[in-house]
Amino acid sequence: PSSAASDVYKRQVVQYLKNQQVETIDYMISSHYDEDHLGGLVKCLDNFEVEHVLGSDYVHTSDLFNTFMNTATAHAIIVEYPSVGDTYEFGTGSFTVMAPDGISQNSNDNSVVIRLVNGNNSFMFMGDAEETSEQDMISTGMNLDCDVLSLGHHGSASSTSWDLLEASTPSWAVLSCGQDNSYGHPAASTMEKLRDMNIPVYRTDDQGTIIALSDGDTISWNQEPCNDYTAGDAKQQSANSDISQAAQYSSEDTASAPAVETETPDASSDTQGRTVWISATGSKYHSRPDCGNMNPNKATQETEAQALSQGYEACKKCW
């Protein structure tokens, strides 16, 4: 993302934690030092009391890495470099470091991977770890079983091997990737594996913020899995095609379409009288007909009040 957009995301991390009444961060874990994983942590160092910072023991040549290390030093925090097998008590549970087992030239394989256990519930957070790191974890013989697997490297083809999925047997997979990202994440091969194993999927590009709460016995979520196994590049191509078709349809019909008088709504009118768009499938209403994977040709218009009365909810992406 651009520096301006990146700064917005960093502020969102801080604001989310403040909304949860977080004042102290017991453990801040920097999986590795790529900008998309490190950026929000600097803001957190400046806004919260941080007890421990865990990171990977290598030097990244970037201004952001230098800022991160200098900010930690300014707050009298020494970055700790854990070893595989190190376990940390955390609330009613604990987490164990699963990787990296050594430092690689590939920064993604330097990701600190943890397995968090709370009672009968378990989560594994992969960072950007790729297949080499996955094989290292499997070779240790450590328990990789987890209820929730946060997929490595945004679902890229270089991560989430069959061996890892068979070793971890997750009940749910969480995929963090940007909407319409230029990398084409997630990869078709990754999504095919999840589909073939019937693993329910949550995706940030489809669903926004995803929250899982563990009480030690059950895991509750803020929404249902989307189970969208479409590859990122295919989704982008489909969206571009839909927009192109909609533009062509509009251009062809403009000349023959009768003039229609439209009435400008009174600015003081109830916002539930405003027009919204509803896709042919889905449970959300939208501010535009081409949000996400919507087909503009099949989108219909209703008032917001009508949409609400039918059980639709506002899309968090476009409102």
Could you describe each region identified by the protein language model?
Residues D233-W319:
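Mature, structured domains enriched in cysteine- and short glycine motifs
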Residues N110-T169:
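Metal-dependent phosphodiesterase/nuclease catalytic metal-binding core
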Residues E35-A74:
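Active-site HxH/HxHxD metal-binding segment of metal-dependent hydrolases
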Residues Y33-L38, H60-D63, D86-E89, E130-Q135, ...:
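Active-site environment of divalent metal-dependent phosphoester hydrolases
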Residues E23-D36, Y58-V59, L149-H153:
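Metallo-beta-lactamase
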Residues P1-A5, Y9:
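Single conserved hydrophobic/aromatic residue that forms the stacking wall/gate
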Residues V59-T96, D101-N108, Q179-D253, A257:
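Binuclear metal-ion centers of metallo-dependent hydrolases, dominated by the metallo-beta-lactamase
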Residues V50, T169-L175:
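Proline-aspartate-enriched helix->loop->beta-strand connector
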